[in-house]
């Protein structure tokens, strides 16, 4: 089954949760996972999408208190110079005793007349990687050349997680990328476990079969309906969770949802992994 549980800010709808609700969610996930007493299970919780450095420190201390293993820190404030980003991570690192994961995605540029988003420089990531409590990075730029440079630069110091086209993307960059984000594994963790075991056994045909018949077809849903609404609606179809949303987010319109149901049925017919759950 699944071993690493990551409460991610966007997937977990942090933008429409209060800080107290985010802490409650972090705690519920952590205590639920830890209740199984499996030493191999890891919980990664997160701070709010937009907050002060002090709030990030408060969340890091709370994560430590509830027994989480790692806190994922995102930086969504406008950036005017790189030292601003470094100082944020350093301040949190200096004031907590929990592992820190860098949620690296394009930064919001505060300089007018410049590109609205900018990538983290390798020099900046190199400095942050040397901070005492920083142990991992979620590489979320979704640019192959950049991902390759970042993973090669940091793989000997940090656990590197890639995002976007999970298993297919991971195969491109292994051994410099240690793990990938699981989308299709949300329906059945065996998808990801079997893929990894096939990789270790050098059964590349099986790896490609899982990618071709599960991951890539599911990505057509993401591309058509959007990742966050698409995956939640698909999980509703498979009996995993409700597709209900909190406004201003709203669930897919009924016609779109019916089309998504048909697409999920087609994927299920191609793969033994996707079996609808029953209560």
What residues fall within each predicted segment?
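Catalytic alpha/beta core domains of metabolic enzymes, predominantly
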Residues: 102-215, 219-225
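Active-site beta->alpha loop and helix N-cap motifs at the rims of alpha/beta catalytic domains
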Residues: 1-119, 248-250, 270-278
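General structural feature for long, well-ordered alpha-helical segments within catalytic domains
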Residues: 21, 25, 55, 59, ...
């Amino acid at each position: 089954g699944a071993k690493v549980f990551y409460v991610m800010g966007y997937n977990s709808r942090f933008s429409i949760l209060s800080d107290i609700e985010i802490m409650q969610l972090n705690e519920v996930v952590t205590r639920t996972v830890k209740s199984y007493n499996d030493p191999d299970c890891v919980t990664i919780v997160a701070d709010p999408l937009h907050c002060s450095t002090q709030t990030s420190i408060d969340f890091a201390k709370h994560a430590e208190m509830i027994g989480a293993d790692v806190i994922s820190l995102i930086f969504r404030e406008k950036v005017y110079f790189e030292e601003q980003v470094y100082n944020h991570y350093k301040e949190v690192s200096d004031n907590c005793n929990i592992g820190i994961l860098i949620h690296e995605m394009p930064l919001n540029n505060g300089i007018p007349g410049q590109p609205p988003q900018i990538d983290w420089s390798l020099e900046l990531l190199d400095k942050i990687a040397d901070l005492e409590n920083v142990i991992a990075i979620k590489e979320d730029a979704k640019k192959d050349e950049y991902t390759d440079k970042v993973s090669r630069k940091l793989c000997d110091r940090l656990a590197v997680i890639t995002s976007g086209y999970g298993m297919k993307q991971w195969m491109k960059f292994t051994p410099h990328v240690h793990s990938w984000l699981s989308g299709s594994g949300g329906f059945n963790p065996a998808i990801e476990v079997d893929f990894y075991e096939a990789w270790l056994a050098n059964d590349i045909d099986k790896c490609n079969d899982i990618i071709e018949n599960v991951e890539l077809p599911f990505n057509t849903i993401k591309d058509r309906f959007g990742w966050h609404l698409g995956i939640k609606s698909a999980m509703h179809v498979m009996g995993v969770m409700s597709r209900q949303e909190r406004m201003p987010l709203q669930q897919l319109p009924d016609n779109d949802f019916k089309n998504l149901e048909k697409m999920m049925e087609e994927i299920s017919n191609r793969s033994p992994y996707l079996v609808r759950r029953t209560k």
